[in-house]
Structure formats: C-alpha cells, structure tokens
C-alpha cells in the first residue's frame, strides 16, 4: 500500500501539545441517560426468523416451509443452527473510503483469498466467539443508530469481554483435559486483554473531563487544589493521570474477580498480624543478640540495623505485599485499614499523612475530600507545599535507607510509591501493567511536584541544570546534598522525558523485569501503547499486519490468534470512525478508511465463514461503496446453492443495513448488488466440463445456475425498512425483467423434442409464484412498468405450460412405444395428454387481441443518423444427434459465410450488415456471434409492427434453426388442397447440414456509429423468439394431431391450425424456415393419410 507506515498525523504527536489540545482528546463529560441501556436492549426483533420461541414474519412460503422442516429435524436439539442469538436492529450510518491503485490491488488480493483462509483457520475461539459475535454486533448497531453514546459503547464492550472471559474460565464445573483447560485459559486471557484495551480507549477518549467545582476553590489555594488544576490543564499530565487511573482500575477489577471466585482477597488477615509477636516473646524470654532488634518501635529495624525474627519478618512482608497490591489498585483507604487491623497504625499514617486526605491529583479525589480545610490550615502555618515536600522527602529517605540495609522489598516499594522513587519500585514489578503503572505514576507525581515548586525562587534554574546533567553525574555529585527544600530533584532523573521514553523504558530498561519486556511483545500491549501515544495510524497498520494473509501462503492465516484480532480490529475501526468524525486531516482519514476497510472486510468474511450471515450487513454497510457491493456479490455467489433459510439471512442483512437504491457515491445499495449478481450469473464461465458426460447436455444444464440467481429478488422485504411497498414493487419489476431475459434464452435451447423438462425455466416459474401471488392479493401496487413486464412473463408462463404438456405427452408416447399391447386405460391417458397439449397450444396460437410476444417498445427512435443495431450471442454448435461440435477456425469461417448468405446481397449492402463469428475466450466449446446492421424505419426506427425482430432476428434464426441440404434464401409455393401456401425465408447455405446453435447468452442493443452500446433493443430478441418458438409450437401441434388421428381420435381444430399458418393476417408464415415448412407439410400429409385410413375403416362394413 502506498501509505507511510512509520508516521502518524501531527495531532497525535505527544510532543505537539497545543495541537493535541485543539484535537480535544479528552472530551467533556456526556450526560448518560438511564434509558440508553433500555433502548439498546429493546432493539427490534423483527429481523430474526426464529428466536427460540417465535417465528417472525417471513412471508415467503418456501422459506416458511423450510423453517418448519428444520425445526422438525432439530426437534431434539437445544440450538437452532444458523439462527442469530440476539436480535439486531437496522443500521443506516455508513463510512466512507477512497482507495488509490495500490490499495485497490491489495484489497482485491485479500478478497480473493480471505474467504478460503477463513474457512480453514483454527477454531479455537469458536465456542466463545459464538457468544460475542451477535452481542457485539447488537451493541454497534445501537451505536450506529444513535441509541447508545460512543463512551457507553466502549464501556459495554469492556463489560462484555470481561463477562465472556469469566464465563469461559469459571462458568463451567466440568473438568477438562489439560490441553482443553490450557486453551480455555488462553481464550479467557485474550478476552481480558481486549477488555483492557477497550477500557484504555474509554479512559483516553471517552471519559469526560470535569471542571473543579466552584465550592471547592479555596483562597488562598492549597497544593492539592493547584495540583488538580495543573493536571486538568496540562495535556501530558492529564494523559499520565488517565493511564494511572486505567491501570489502577484494571488491578482493582482483578481483585474483585479474585474475591468473587475465591471468596477472599488480599488483606484478609487476623487482627494484629503485624505486631511482631514472635520477636516480642523472644525478647522477653532470651533477651537479645546482635542480629535481633532490641526495641519494638516501627523505626527500630532501620535505626538499629537489626532484623525481626524470620516468622515475624515473613508475616510483615506478607502484610506489606498486600499493602502494595492495594496501593497498586488505587485502594489507599483499604491499605490504611489493613495496616491498622494488622497493628501498624503508624504505617497507615505514612500512607495518608494529612488527616486521611486523598492527595491524588484528580478532580475525583478533590470532590471526595470535600470542603476539608485541614490542608489549607497546615500550609498557612508551614508554607505552601512545604509539608507535602517534607513528607515525600522523608518517604524517599526511608525507601533508600531500608533498601541499603536489604530490608523487605515490598516495604521499600510502599515508601517509594509515596515519593516517585522509581528505582525502588521496579524490582517488584514483575508484569507489564505494574511496571507501566509505576513509571506513569512516578512521572505524574514529579510533574505535579515540579509545578508546585515553581513558587520557590531559584529552584527552577536548579531544576533545569539538573535535567541537563547526566543521571550519573546527578546521582554521584550533588544528590546527597539535596534536602526537603530541593524536592523533587532527588528523583527527577529517574523519570522519563516524555511518553515515548516511558514506553521505551518498558521495552529495554535495565531495571525492568524480563516478564515486562516479554509483555511488550503481546498484541494487546502493543495496541495499548499505540493508544497511549495517540498513534492511531500505526495502530491500524499493526492490526492489519497481524491479520493479513501471508504473502507466500495466501490460503492460511498466521497462527497467532488472528480470529480474535480480526474481531477486535473491526470493532476498533468502527469505534475510531465514530470518534474521529470531523477532527481528522485528510491523510489520517485516508488511512482510517483504507486500512479500516481492509480490516472490516476481513471480519465480515470471517463472520460469513462462520455462518453468521445475518451479522455481515452491519459491518459491510460501513465499507466503501464498491467494497460493500463486491463483498455482498461474492457472498451471494458462494451461497447460491445454499438453503432458502441461509439465503434469506443474507437478503435481510443487505436490505436492512443498506439503502435499496443509490443515495450517493459513498455507500453501497441493494440495487447495484443484485444487478451485479444477476449480470454475473449470465456471464460465460470458464469451461469445466466432466468428460464422462455429454458436453452439450452439461451446457444446457447451466440454465439452472442462471435461474437460481433470481431467487435473491423473490424474498419478501422486511416491513421495518423505509418505503417497503415501493421496494417490493421494484423487486418484482427486476425479477420480472430478468426472468423475461432468461426465458428468451431458455426457450431457444428448449427446442429439442425430448421428454426432459427445461429445468431453468420451470425453476424461474417456481421462484416467482410467491411474489406474483402477493401481487394478486395487492393489485394496487401494480404500476404500468410492472404491468408491461408482467404481460411478457404471463406469455412465457403460458408458453412453458404448453411446453410442459407436450413433453408429458411425449413421455407417454415413448413409454407406450416399448409396450406391444396397451390397455384401454393407458391409451386413454395418452389421448387425454395429447388433447391437453393440443388445446393449450391452440389457445396460445389463436390469441387475437394480444398475440403472443407482441408489445410496444420502451424505446422507439423515430429518426437518428447512423443508428445501428447489434445482436450478441454466445452459443454451442450441436449436431443433429444432440452432441457438441467443437468449433475451430474453419467452422467459424464457414458459419460466418453461411450467416451472410442467409440474406440477399442487396440486404447486406443496404443495411451494412456485419457478421463476426469467433471461438469464445472463456469456453472453447462455444462460439461468439456478433451481428450488426443499420437501423431503418420499421426495424430500429419507429414502431416495429411486424413483430419478427427484423433482419438481425432473421439471420440469427437461420443459425438457431440450422441448415438443410438445399439451404438458401428462398421463395416458392406449396399446393396442397384445400390450401395453397407461399413460402419464403432465410436458410443457411455452405454449412454442415443439421447443425444448430444452442444459446448461452443473447442480447440485442441500439448502438452508435462508433460502436458504443446504448440501450437494449428488446424487440429483436422477442422477434427471434417468435421466429423460433411459434413455428416449433405449430410443428409440435401437428405432431400431436397426427398422433390423435392415428389413434382414432381426430382433433376438432386441425383445419383451424392450418388456416392460422396460411393466413396473411397472422404473419406466421414468415416465421417458418423452409425446413420447418417441409416438416409441416409432411405432418399434414401424414394427417391426411391417417384421416383417409380412418374414414375407410369407419365406412367398411
């Protein structure tokens, strides 16, 4: 990708404080309504098909029947497979994104591989993921609709992660094997890491910033009040404060969990556990020795350079370890209570020196202290901040003295926390969170101390000179001479200079525990450190680097927790987009859109691979327009042969979260998705034929694949969407339009007189039965544009009904031919089938008011210079046996010449007819035929009253009908009393006899002089269908009539059929080829001969 991976926007630079202040990283507190959670939980349930108790309004009969079937099949199971666990409400907010060429190439590479990769990834997180997919989607859906504030969303995400983690780790009493238990611990830990990241994001970007209450502003001010105001206004200090509070909050929640699970936590000791009972008894009994202290006051071990007895020492260290743990969790009061209960009230006094006041520099601590004026009184007497500096200096001296005498490490650390003595805290910080807390808290306290020291004259210059010196010079040169008035020079050079230096110290500091260094390499720690730095750009890059397919192995994910990171990354992208709406520059906006779309796309396909199709729409709706469309098209194609239930979930997901029609250039919409699906379903696929099965038959079966695509338009849209009636009408219109296109193609490959039913056409009819039934129940929704397409659909419905009855009759004929003697019942069945076939065919052929397949054109061009017509066809050449003729250059050239010869040379010149035949680039068994000619009045210009498709239809019909031995452009007369029929038409010449074209795709267009296609010329294809279907229907009727006559059941309307063909008014004669008319006359001859034979039998005695 053409993006700078090492830089971030300037407003995320921790050094550029003024810019960061303008960015308003810390927002004003939002007022949270108690109704928000209720709103988010009461999201519309209309979107679920089945929620465990009720079936929700899918009106499609096929879908309802399949739901019932699945319920019966799964009657004894507790979980309904494929059903979402939580109701998801509609989302209308979408994101924007623009890719450059490199990003687009990367996106397409990922799209082509990600679904396969998602399918074979490790399923370690499947169990826990199933409980969070729908939950997280529901939360984000509520946030996108404005039902939940963004800060509240972050808190809910953290809470959800914690709850699921606890459920995995402690929710089951079942004993697991060692490997399973390890995996469950890993899952729970990953979710805790995610919860920590959400908590940090809330502390940094979601938590409000309170102002100092007016009633707490004191005059003269106090050191604590000044410290709180400084931290409130200084960006770096505020950042440190929030990091410290975040880490203390994590530690506190960990203690609560320990108490919840184990029933107890730190500090649960017997009273007076720290009174050194063993040492007391030893002194009373044995006196003392050199190594044992002589007095029992709290300062005795340090003053006498002596030790407690081992048992008391261990007990004391245990108490101090718990005191440290409570301080680390921000529970100072509990730590003081522990000290008092252990008999060490003096230690509690060292923790809270100012009458128990909380001296933490936060507004919360200030409010907690209330209007207490103790500190103000103290500082009025001793001077501003003097007592505070004295206390910290004393704590520093104590920590150093105890450390020098190898005292307890926790006692050293407890004193060190009071004075920012980082070097004495880090040795007991054996995890990343503790080390980060120690550094951030020390740095925060020193920043506050430096600010408070500004009131002392001359001290500022000493601070600057001390900072300029190296840490070694400061440590060895003048630190020993520092007194309380010099605070905080004693610990100044222990602190980082900025936040990147703090994080670098975590990575490679000499005093940092190796476990801390290892923790820096964990994924969520890296995420959290980038959030602290505000380097969101780099954060997106590293998340994408973790989940992107490997360059050398596109079929697999990297084996380090990618499913979890995909989910987290997608949700992080959505939160960041909601947070940074108007406050970002173009470069960062581009990064957030580009890389964010890649991550969202990956997660959407991951959900798809886990059969959570109903959740995909929430995330897909946030993708850029083209990505959203491509994603849904890809999913629909992969689920093309899935159950109705699964396909309906995808349909609902798209309908609910996307607009139906295009709204702008940024957002995806259902119309474009379904148009792309339908268009791609008609494309010629790369040839993959089974050599053991006839290629031509496999080619005809492709019609089923085209028909299945129409089902996406036949579902009932949910009643919750906007303008549902209008959407329903548009779906019906598109389904009718596309079905008519397919019906035309299917009719041209269903000319073979075999019993097999054309599966594609009848699949279309079955899909459209339900929408048309609903249309009949609501006739008010029928608009003119729907009516026109509906009329053609009804024509095709009638035609395929005739076709089905003919094939049913043909089936009887073939079955009866194998039996020597038929029973009366079998004969009667054949006769009934024949009469039904003949009656339905004549009903279609004899229509007077609205002849079959004759309509007014949508686009009628009266006059236009250089308007051309084009017909594009992809077809397979078939021998008379039905087998495929594989084309080569010679065959193509011969067919092209034959098509030219099917019309006169005068027509070729006048109409500028051009014919091109070539082998298909995608299927070597198929040919591509392109016909082009000049439009003239009556054929392209003005109304087309002949309804025969014009010259292009005539040339194409010659190819579909094939050639006989005498193929040419002909005109002659048949005389067969009592009728005289003049014959003319187009035939192929100089081409193999009996070879016909089986259509794969057929389109006709109006085109410009330059060859650009303008609008469809539907009349050409309809006319072609009339040229091919009506003569075939007549011939089939003749075949059935002959059969009835031979069986002694003469049809009543045979002469009417002959008159229909011979009549000039119907124009049927122009639709026949010479070969078809020859067959027609042969059938008529057979009919007359059978009639004479029957008359002779009846007249004979």
UniProtKB/Swiss-Prot annotation:
One Pfam family in the UniProt entry: Nup84_Nup100
Keywords tagged on the record: mRNA transport, Nuclear pore complex, Nucleus, Protein transport, Translocation, Transport
Domain of life: Eukaryota
GO MF, one example: structural constituent of nuclear pore
Coiled-coil portions: none
One GO term of the biological process aspect: protein transport
Localization (cell): Nucleus envelope; Nucleus, Nuclear pore complex
A cellular component term, taken from the record's GO annotations: nuclear envelope
InterPro entries membership: Nup84/Nup107
Subunit: Part of the nuclear pore complex (NPC). The NPC has an eight-fold symmetrical structure comprising a central transport channel and two rings, the cytoplasmic and nuclear rings, to which eight filaments are attached. The cytoplasmic filaments have loose ends, while the nuclear filaments are joined in a distal ring, forming a nuclear basket. NPCs are highly dynamic in configuration and composition, and can be devided in 3 subcomplexes, the NUP62 subcomplex, the NUP107-160 subcomplex and the NUP93 subcomplex, containing approximately 30 different nucleoporin proteins.
Family, per entry: Belongs to the nucleoporin Nup84/Nup107 family.
Record protein name field: Nuclear pore complex protein NUP107
């Amino acid at each position: 990708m053409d993006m700078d991976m090492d830089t971030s926007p300037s407003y995320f630079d921790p050094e550029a404080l003024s810019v960061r202040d303008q960015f308003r990283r810390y927002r004003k507190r939002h007022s949270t309504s108690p109704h928000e959670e209720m709103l988010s939980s009461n999201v519309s349930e209309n979107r679920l098909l089945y929620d465990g108790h009720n079936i929700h309004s899918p009106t499609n009969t096929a879908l309802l029947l399949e739901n019932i079937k699945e319920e019966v099949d799964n009657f004894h199971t507790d979980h309904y497979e494929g059903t979402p666990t939580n109701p998801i409400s509609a989302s209308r907010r979408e994101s924007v994104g623009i890719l450059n060429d490199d990003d687009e190439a990367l996106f397409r590479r990922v799209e082509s591989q990600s679904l396969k990769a998602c399918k074979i990834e490790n399923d370690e997180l499947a169990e826990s993921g199933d409980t969070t997919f729908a939950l997280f989607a529901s939360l984000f859906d509520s946030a996108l609709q404005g039902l939940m504030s963004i800060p509240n969303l972050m808190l809910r995400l953290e809470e959800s992660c914690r709850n699921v983690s606890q459920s995995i780790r402690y929710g089951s009493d079942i004993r697991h094997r060692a490997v399973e238990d390890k995996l469950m611990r890993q899952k729970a830990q990953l979710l805790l890491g995610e919860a920590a990241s959400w908590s940090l994001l809330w502390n940094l970007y979601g938590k409000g910033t309170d102002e100092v209450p007016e009633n707490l502003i004191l005059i003269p001010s106090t050191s604590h009040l000044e410290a709180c105001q400084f931290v409130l206004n200084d960006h770096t200090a505020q950042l440190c404060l929030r990091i410290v509070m975040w880490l203390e909050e994590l530690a506190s929640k960990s203690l609560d969990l320990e108490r919840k699970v184990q029933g107890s936590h730190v500090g649960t000791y017997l009273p007076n556990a720290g009174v050194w009972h063993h040492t007391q008894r030893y002194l009373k009994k044995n006196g003392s020795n050199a190594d044992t202290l002589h007095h029992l006051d709290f300062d005795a071990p340090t003053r006498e350079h002596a030790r407690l007895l081992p048992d008391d020492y261990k007990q004391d260290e245990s108490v101090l370890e718990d005191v440290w743990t409570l301080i680390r969790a921000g529970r100072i009061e509990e730590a003081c209570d522990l000290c008092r209960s252990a008999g060490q009230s003096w230690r509690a006094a060292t923790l809270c020196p100012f009458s128990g006041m909380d001296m933490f520099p936060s507004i919360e601590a200030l409010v907690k202290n209330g209007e207490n004026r103790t500190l103000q009184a103290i500082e009025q007497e001793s001077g501003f901040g003097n007592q505070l500096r004295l206390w910290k200096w004393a704590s520093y001296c104590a920590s150093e003295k105890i450390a020098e005498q190898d005292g307890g490490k926790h006692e050293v650390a407890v004193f060190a926390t009071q004075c920012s003595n980082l070097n004495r805290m880090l040795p007991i910080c054996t995890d990343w969170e503790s080390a980060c807390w120690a550094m951030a808290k020390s740095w925060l306290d020193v920043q506050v101390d430096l600010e408070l020291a500004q009131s002392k004259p001359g001290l500022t210059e000493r601070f600057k000179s001390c900072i300029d010196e190296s840490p070694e010079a400061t440590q060895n040169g003048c630190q020993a001479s520092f007194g309380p008035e010099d605070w905080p020079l004693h610990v100044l050079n222990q602190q980082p200079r900025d936040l990147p230096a703090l994080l670098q110290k975590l990575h490679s500091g000499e005093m940092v525990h190796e476990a801390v260094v290892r923790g820096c390499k964990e994924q969520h720690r890296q995420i959290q450190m980038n959030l602290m730095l505000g380097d969101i750009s780099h954060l997106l890059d590293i998340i994408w680097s973790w989940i992107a397919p490997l360059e050398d192995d596109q079929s697999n994910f990297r084996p380090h927790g990618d499913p979890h990171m995909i989910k987290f990354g997608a949700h992080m992208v959505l939160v960041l987009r909601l947070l940074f709406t108007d406050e970002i520059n173009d470069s960062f906006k581009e990064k957030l859109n580009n890389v964010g779309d890649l991550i969202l796309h990956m997660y959407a396909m991951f959900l798809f691979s886990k059969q959570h199709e109903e959740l995909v729409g929430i995330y897909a709706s946030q993708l850029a327009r083209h990505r959203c469309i491509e994603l849904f098209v890809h999913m629909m194609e992969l689920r093309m042969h899935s159950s109705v239930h699964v396909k309906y979930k995808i349909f609902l997901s798209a309908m609910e979260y996307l607009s139906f029609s295009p709204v702008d250039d940024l957002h995806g919409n259902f119309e474009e998705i379904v148009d792309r699906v339908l268009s791609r379903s008609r494309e010629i696929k790369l040839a993959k034929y089974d050599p053991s099965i006839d290629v031509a038959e496999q080619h005809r079966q492709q019609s089923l694949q085209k028909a299945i695509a129409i089902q996406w338009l036949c579902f009932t849209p949910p009643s919750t969407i906007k303008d549902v009636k209008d959407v329903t009408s548009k779906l019906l219109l598109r389904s009718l339009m596309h079905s008519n296109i397919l019906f035309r193609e299917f009719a041209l490959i269903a000319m073979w007189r075999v019993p097999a039913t054309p599966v594609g056409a009848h699949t279309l009819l079955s899909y459209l039965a339900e929408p048309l039934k609903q249309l009949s129940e609501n006739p008010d929704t029928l608009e003119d544009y729907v009516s026109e397409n509906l009329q053609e659909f009804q024509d095709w419905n009638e035609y395929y009904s005739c076709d089905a009855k003919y094939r049913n009759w043909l089936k009887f004929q073939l079955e009866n031919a194998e039996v020597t003697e038929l029973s009366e019942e079998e004969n009667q069945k054949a006769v009934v089938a024949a009469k039904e076939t003949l009656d339905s065919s004549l009903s279609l052929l004899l229509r007077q008011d609205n002849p079959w397949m004759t309509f007014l054109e949508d686009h009628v061009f009266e006059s236009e210079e250089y308007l051309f017509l084009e017909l594009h066809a992809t077809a397979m050449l078939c021998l008379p046996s039905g087998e495929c003729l594989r084309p080569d250059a010679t065959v193509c050239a011969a067919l092209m010449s034959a098509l030219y010869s099917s019309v006169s040379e005068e027509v070729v010149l006048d109409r500028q007819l051009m014919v091109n035949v070539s082998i298909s680039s995608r299927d070597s068994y198929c040919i591509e035929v392109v016909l082009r000619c000049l439009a003239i009045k009556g054929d392209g210009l003005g109304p087309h009253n002949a309804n025969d498709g014009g010259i292009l239809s005539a040339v194409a019909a010659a190819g579909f009908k094939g050639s006989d031995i005498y193929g040419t452009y002909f005109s002659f007369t048949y005389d067969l009393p009592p009728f005289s029929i003049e014959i003319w038409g187009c035939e192929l010449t100089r081409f193999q006899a009996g070879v016909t074209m089986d259509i794969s795709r057929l389109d006709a267009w109006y085109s410009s002089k330059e060859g650009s296609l303008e609008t469809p010329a539907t009349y050409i294809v309809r006319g072609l269908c009339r040229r091919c279907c009506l003569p075939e229907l007549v011939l089939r009727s003749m075949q059935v009539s002959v059969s009835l006559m031979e069986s002694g059941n003469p049809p009543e309307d045979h002469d009417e059929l002959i008159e229909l063909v011979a009549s000039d008014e119907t124009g049927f004669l122009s639709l026949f080829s010479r070969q078809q008319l020859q067959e027609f006359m042969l059938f008529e001859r057979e009919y007359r001969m059978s009639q004479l034979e029957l008359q002779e039998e009846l007249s004979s005695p």
